[in-house]
Amino acid sequence: MTTASIRRGYHVIKTILHFGLDDLIPKHKKPWYFAIVRNSLFWVRNKHKTKSPAERLKLAMQDLGPVYIKLGQMLSTRRDLLDDEWAYQLAMLQDRVPPFDSALAREAIEAELGAPIATYFDDFNDTPLASASISQVHTATLKSNGKAVVLKVLRPNVEQQILADLQLMTQTANLLETLLGDGNRLRPAEVIEDYRTTILGELNLKLEALNAIKLRNNFLGSNSLYVPFVYEEHSYQRLMVMERIYGIPVSDTEALRAQGTNFKLLAERGVELFFTQVFRDNFFHADMHPGNIFISREHPDDPFYIGLDCGIMGTLTEVDKRYLAENFLAFFNRDYHRIAQLYIESGWVSEHTDIIAFEQAVKVVCEPMFNKPLDEISFGHVLLELFRTARHFDIVVQPQLVLLEKTLLYIEGLGRQLYPQLDLWQTAKPFLENWMSEQVGPKAMFNKVKSNAPFWADKLPEFPELIYDNLKLGRKLLGTQQQMLDKYLRYQQKSHKSNYLLITSAVLLICGTILFTQIVTLWPAYTCIGAGILIWAIGWRSRPKNRKF
């Protein structure tokens, strides 16, 4: 353990005590050494006793810096784990940090390019356009075509800082599994592992560039989403160069209203955009918070979204997609038994789950939702409540579904912020029903045959040879099986004969012994015993020697 990690660990412990987070651990769960640590830092007092535990956690994470802020933001989306108050407080965390020195930014960019910035760019602006915990963005003009671009570069030494904090988080999470009364329900170790995967993925800007290119290609010519062009030849692990956009932040409703944006159409397109990404492309933007979404300035009566920051993307298996679509349809049909069946069939909960008990639990949670109009029912909260219910039946956590739930909550919140009258069900239902019709029935079968036709056309010339080889193999197997059967029958015949003789000899020996003790004339006894020994010898010699068939 390095001096820096010891110092960081001390700062984390001090912050926990300063905000009174140690009070959240039940007294009977605190280990013997906890009091020693607490007393050795007697001058650190809880100065926030009047604040709620959730607010104290938010303030502590804000104080601990960017890595913990991003963890808090991720936790705020895990409403299947946290109560609403905790999720609300953590959602207020802001990933805003002071920019780092532009000289360091230049040095990092040139190290990735392998050449001075002026070789490829003009008008590089030392003042960053934006600054976050992991990266910083500068503007410039690309020399090759004169177009405005942005350069996203990772902060210096950010990987080492994140790995050090992740190590501390993992150790703390393992301790909390034991100390917290509901540690198993909150699953801190699982949450940190999920966070590790997410944040380490954000450290690879080359991967983000490839994600952006794929998402852009999926929506080329679309009237709902535009993804800026990425200059792949200038993108590396610590640097990404992309087209500069000039949209309006989706959270700036005043500016959108001032330009006459069609909010109803924009909200509906947001819902369609989500379901298209999930069910058509199986590749969805999983970090669609307001800071990553802009709205076009052109044609406000026919607006489209502009998507940035493709560091976190989600995918679902075909099985997950089908069960998810069926889940939503079953919910709106109030078919709770089918919902319970789907969770078990999909493997999201154990096959040994009591389906009747699970169905009743789902009904208790879902039925009250129908007391309000359909246009007020939230897809995200339906999924959230189902996950929360499944927690009590030991749901097998599916990271891809957690990303989906988070994204769906973002999209719904965004849609209703833009257009409060948005009827999510009426917008999504035709999409889900059309997608389901393509997955089952004659049309689905025809599409699958059609999609596999090139494969079978490629294999068709090999069919005669494959058929001939299989016939030869079949004949060979048949001959081998016949030989094994013959050997087995011979073995059985010998075995039966041997057993018969051995049993007969045993009977004769027993009879001879009885006669030997009961009568005066001994020749019958000797005859039985002699015959028994002879028959035993014959039976013993006739035993089958080999059991291999």
Curated annotation (Swiss-Prot):
It is found in: Cell inner membrane. GO terms for biological process: regulation of ubiquinone biosynthetic process; ubiquinone biosynthetic process. The keyword Transmembrane applies. Its EC number is 2.7.-.-. SUPFAM superfamilies: Protein kinase-like (PK-like). CDD domains: UbiB. This is Probable protein kinase UbiB. The lineage of its organism: Bacteria, Pseudomonadati, Pseudomonadota, Gammaproteobacteria, Alteromonadales. The gene is ubiB.
